[in-house]
Amino acid sequence: MATDGASCEPDFSRAPEDAAGATAEAAKKEFDVDTLSKSELRMLLSVMEGELEARDLVIEALRARRKEVFIQERYGRFNLNDPFLALQRDYEAGAGDKEKKPVCTNPLSILEAVMAHCRKMQERMSTQLAAAESRQKKLEMEKLQLQAVEQEHQKLAARLEEERGKNKHVVLMLVKECKQLSGKVIEEAQKLEEVMVKLEEEKTKTSALEEELSAEKRRSTEMEAQMEKQLSEFDTEREQLRAKLHREEAHTTDLKEEIDKMKKMIEQLKRGNDSKPSLSLPRKTKDRRMVSISVGTEGPVTRSVACQTDLVIESTDHVKKLPLTVPVKPSAGSPLVPANTKGNVCTGAALGRPGIDRQASHGDLIGSSPPTVPPPSANRIEENGPSAGSASSTPPLPNSTAPPTVQTPGIAPQSYSQAPPVHSLHSPCANASLHPGLNPRIQAARFRFQGNANDPDQNGNTTQSPPSRDVSPTSRDNLVAKQLARNTVTQALSRFTSPQAGAPPRPGAAPTGDGGTCPPVGRTSLKTPGVARVDRGNPPPIPPKKPGLSQTPSPPHPQLKVIMDSSRASNAGAKVDNKTMASPPSSLPQGNRVINEENLPKSSSPQLPPKPSIDLTVAPAGCAVSALATSQVGAWPAETPGLNQPACSESSLVIPTTIAFCSSINTVSASSCRTGASDSLLVTASGWSPSLTPLLMSGGPAPLAGRPTLLQQAATQGNVTLLSMLLNEEGLDINYSCEDGHSALYSAAKNGHTDCVRLLLNAGAQVNAADTNGFTPLCAAAAQGHFKCVELLISYDANINHAADEGQTPLYLACKNGNKECIQLLLEAGTDRSVKTRDGWTPVHAAVDTGNVDSLKLLMYHRAPACRNSLHEEESESVVFDLDQGEESPEGTSKPVVPAELINHADREGWTAAHIAASKGFKNCLEILCMHGGLEPERKDKCHRTAHDVATDDCKHLLENLNALKIPLRISVGETEPGSYGSDDFECENTICALNIRKQTSWDDFSKAVSQALTNHFQAISSDGWWSLEDVTLNNTTDSSIGLGTSSVRSIMLGNAPWSAGQSFTQSPWDFMKKNKAERVTVLLSGPQEGCLSSVTYASMIPLQMLQNYLRLVEQYHNVIFHGPEGSLQDYIAHQLALCMKHRQMAAGFTCEIVRAEVDAGFSKEQLIDLFINSACLIPVKQSPVNKKIIIILENLEKSSLSELLGDFLAPLENRSTESPWTFQKGNGTSECYYFHENCFLMGTIAKACLQGSDLLVQQHFRWVQLRWDGEPMQGLLQRFLRRKVVNKFRGQVPSPCDPVCKTVDWALAVWRQLNSCLARLGTPEALLGPKYFLSCPVVPGHAQATVKWMAKLWNAIIAPRVQEAILSRASVKRQPGLGLATAKKHPSQGQQAVVKAALSILLNKAVLHGCPLPRAELDQHAADFRGGSFPLSIVSSYHSYSKKKGESGAWRKVSTSPRKKSGRFSPPSWNKPGLSEEGIRIKAVSQQNCNRNASLSKQKSLENDLSLTLNLDQRLSLGSDDEADLVKELQSMCSSRSESDISKIADSRDDLRRFDGSRNNPAFSTVNPRMPVSPKEVSPLSSHETTECSNSQSKIELGVSRVKSFLPVPRSKVTQCSQNTKRSSSSSNTRQIEINNNTKEDIWNFHQNEQVEKPNQ
């Protein structure tokens, strides 16, 4: 471009050219496009575009001008007003010059053409105008509709505005409330925060206080422990020092007495010319050495029995130096005897002086010493407390027997035949009595030996030295060997006794360690084997100082009573080696006498006194009274129901340093076995020997042995000092139990030693340790009445509800023994009053049995402190039924605490506490029981006796006077109008229960009782099973399933006086009933008169909620029709709803009228019109609506055609306004418009299960209420109605399910359900029955025959005719679905008759007679009363059902009628050969037996006889229609099915019947009759077997009846299934069925059996 631009510029350098030429060139160069610049080109382009646009405008203007000129030139001469000119124009323009013809040649023709053209145009315009007018009309219609819509829209908009305004207001209110509530919430939150802060502060303070308190508790516990330790140390030291002092004193005294005795014995031996007296001294000293035990220095030498026999000799001279008295419970004992340091008191030892009495054998000394009276100093005996004999002439004797008693042969019989080492706690007498023939001087000497040996110390503590010569009882050889060393002494003694034949020890006797009842054999009897029985003589002379002993201070421990008077001398006989010995007990302390029950003499000796004492002989070697001795005590019967075990203190008391022989206790007299002699209730109740209790519980020292035994002894005797010493020892088992299971705690609690119990509990003793019978320490203390021990044990968490082996609790034992304080403590601790013993007794039984009024009051009225501590402040809640609040109530205004179940509890024999009190004449106890509102005085025992029957005269009078008024409570539904409303079977009144009204019953209690009775009754009649009122009370729901409750009550009549719940009169209910002579209480339910439906619900048993729903439908929709099977109470429901509506409208101020019209076949449409007009239901359009309410009921609409009767009224009924009028043509040709107003209600009833045909057109215009037989309310109505009938018959009581009445009612209910199931299965809904016909079922207790007869009448009169008509109607070929039963043939064919008879027979057997509660024999008699039961079902079974495969048409079925090929075994059944048919029947029965089929008909003989009479075999079942064929197949399937008793599984596909051929499991299909209305539920695919298989598990042989042939057909598939697999379950997975009603049970139809087996479907 630069070059271009440059070249465009003129070049002035070429001057030589002339000027003209230059100018021309310059001009050319200017217009050269190529030389133009870009901007110049753009300018040039724009100029050219402007020129083009100007040219276009000029061209357009020229064209327009040309057109105007052309038009003016051509058409300017023409005028539109002249048609000729137009025609001429067209002519000239249309054709060429050649074709142009002159237009005006014929003006007429031209005019005609113009006219024709105008006519055509006019016609076209007229059609267009008509179309425009129609469109205009449509537009106007649409405008009108639009205006109406706009008006509606405006109305809706206005309503919405109003609603929005209201909602806005509500929202504002809610917002305001929310703000207020949020403010309150904030305030509450602030308050809560403040409270939480305070709570935290309080928690902090509380925790600080708790810490301080725990610290204080720890300090106090530590201080107590230190104090206890110091006290125990002080006690130990004191006792040791005291024992040392006693030892020294005793030693000194013994030495003096020994010197005197030695001198006297030497003289006596010299006079007796005895050759062996020299042996006594060495043996004496030797024995002394052997028994010695050091006090404080030596530990207890606890040698076992076997060891001690050999080691005894090693203990040497410690005896003389250190005689030890162990502080046991202070008792009479010998101060001379040294024992082990810690209290190993030699329980069984004859504890003599150190010189003599400590020896194991003193027989030589006794035998040689002359009988002398011991000096007073030698006989210083202190008794531990006042024993019963202390005040008598006979002083209490020491607890240890003198050694001679055991050594001498005479002693052996006393302990047991061979048990010399028995520890006689009344030593002198026992020893003396052993040798009644002895010289009195020798007896006196022996007496002195014994007395000195057992003299107690000043504190009454016996110092006993363990014997050293005793041999282990298990080794008789050792025993005899040891005894041989003592033979000389024994022979010396025996010379002074009457000679007896030598009686060696009994072989086979139990060893010492046994706790058994037989006496130990191998005891260390110091007598020689040849020693004979020693005859007992008079008691020895009493030492002069003995009586004074009773004046010594008694120990602090409580003394237990003794059994016998010591002043009363009596001879007790003890059987020893079958010989009886007498012992004089008068000089013995009763507290120390022990009885051995096992050796009770069978024949008492003539000397036996009524209250003999018994000698407990003591082994001279120190044998303890062991468990062998005590275990003999179990022979006595227990007074108390439990605690039959001897006390622990009777356990074997083994002495550690000696050989312990369990010496048996020998019973001296049979009379000593008398219970009740002991004051210890527990002892006597436990069966202890009364003589044993003083031994173990009296103040005298009990025999002591090993540490555990010592512990039990100390606990038994209450020796706190010894117990504390023992508890401080290490390694001691404080929970040690003897063979009877008695622990130390048990013994202490049983004997009431509270201090010992506290010590043991603090030491950790097991508080709930039980003995062998399950009794705990608390049981023992409660039985004995030791309430302080009970309180202490409870505070240590003893189990207050512990039950012994027989079920006795501490409360029971306390009640049994009348221990009021213990009962109160246990009740306050919260013990259970309802625990029962094994015999069914409760504490109430126990208290009543003893006649203890205080105990019974406590049980009935005392509350646990959890409620209130005071017995009289509390007010118990009122009991449900009849409560007494007695004026005479022993507890003032308080009410019983125990429930009625406990008061009325019966034991094994059926006896209640009232039976016991009445039979024993405890009138006060019976009166207290009668104060309880729940007492049932009519309760019967197992012998059907009431308390009145077994009562004494006084108690009978009391029961008759205190018995409650029994007022029947009845429910009334008001007066029901008789007639055709379906209420004929409804009872006006029903008794629901009897109210017990007592003098103490208040009006509040009465009101609660009535309310509870009503609630229970409503729940009982509406429950699913037979529940009693007691079972129903567990349900706390206020309303029953039918909707009734206490709110349904209108008023209550007390006799003739009105009363309302909660109302009170000045008189009590008792007085009011008596004064007004009210014989019943009637409850009136609210009914239609009050605008309620409660009475209708109760009368008809239709749930209240459903009735209220029906009423709502009528009031809301105005047109309601009730339809269901005949007898479904449609008329009753409609009429009751109408009554309720009428009274509601009248209460609202309207007048109301009910108009009933019964429709029949002749009821015409004109009559209906007159009815509507006359009742003012149809009113003229010109007339304004009336305020009157009209309710029209059209009954039995099934008898007319709904479409014909109501067809014209459908629209006016649906749209009730003048806009939808109904025109009525009058007879004179005029018409008038009517309409239905809003105040008209129309109800109709139809007794038809379903609508058909043209009636279905009516269905959409009405609201329909369908009353199905298999759905509520009809399904449960009959069950509830009959249950209420039974309750009324039993006067309010619900019988048990096994009652015959219940079974009969259940059968009637099952008949109705099974019958409808079968009829539905057959496809005959016309024959379905509602429950109305079954409401009249008679309820006669004990007479089921009446119900069966009623069922026969119902069957013959109603059921069978309906079934017959329905079957014929279905079997007829030309069946019109609209007319139902009316078109059945009047003259049915024989085939149809056969079908009817077969159907009746099958229904009768499967639905009616099946499950009848009558025995088979009676049922066979009544079966003849039923019509149609004798038809031979073999006809049905041998009928061939034709196969029809899936997808085949009916035409194909008719073609393929030839039966399938049979197998070679069976010939095909023939219609024309009766023989073959009967053979088929027989074969069928055999096959059924093979399959374990158990279905049989009632009368086989009659069936067989009638086989040829019913129909000719040539004509049997020659059915001519598909309906008949389908029906027969239905019947066949019903026969073969075992689950048709409740056909809830309805399947139209069925099995082929078995035809005895080889084909197996071959199903046949049948089409559903297209003319029959079948619900989809009734169709299901075919299964290989329809319902169930035949299985062995379901086969039952009928009782007492051989199986008979069954003519019922069986599906072929079942033969195969039964033969191939008989153990399969009755339901198969291949079975596919559609269930109706969701029933999950299939019933097996066993005809004429009393039970009906059911199996659930899988």
From Swiss-Prot:
The keyword Cytoplasm applies. Residues 399-418, 580-590, 1559-1569, 1581-1595 have a biased composition (Polar residues). InterPro entries: Ankyrin_rpt (IPR002110), Ankyrin_rpt-contain_sf (IPR036770), Cortactin-Actin_Reg (IPR050719), Cortactin-binding_p2_N (IPR019131). ANK repeats lie at residues 706-736, 740-769, 773-802, 806-835, 839-868, 909-939. It comes from the Eukaryota. Residues 385-394, 509-520, 1619-1633 have a biased composition (Low complexity). The keyword Phosphoprotein applies. The modification Phosphoserine is found at residue 1521. It is found in: Cytoplasm, Cell cortex; Cell projection, Dendritic spine. The modification Asymmetric dimethylarginine is found at residue 495. Residues 119-276 form a coiled coil. One of its GO terms (molecular function) is protein phosphatase 2A binding. Residues 1-24, 203-235, 348-437, 451-475, 495-612, 1448-1478, 1538-1595, 1611-1642 are annotated as: Disordered. Keywords: ANK repeat, Cell projection, Coiled coil, Cytoplasm, Methylation, Phosphoprotein, Repeat, Synapse. One of its GO terms (cellular component) is dendritic spine. SMART domains: ANK. Residues 214-235, 1539-1558 have a biased composition (Basic and acidic residues). Regulates the dendritic spine distribution of CTTN/cortactin in hippocampal neurons, and thus controls dendritic spinogenesis and dendritic spine maintenance. Associates with the striatin-interacting phosphatase and kinase (STRIPAK) core complex to regulate dendritic spine distribution of the STRIPAK complex in hippocampal neurons. Interacts with CTTN/cortactin SH3 domain. Interacts with STRN, STRN4/zinedin and MOB4/phocein; this interactions mediate the association with the STRIPAK core complex and may regulate dendritic spine distribution of the STRIPAK complex in hippocampal neurons. Activation of glutamate receptors weakens the interaction with STRN and STRN4. This is Cortactin-binding protein 2. It comes from Neofelis nebulosa.
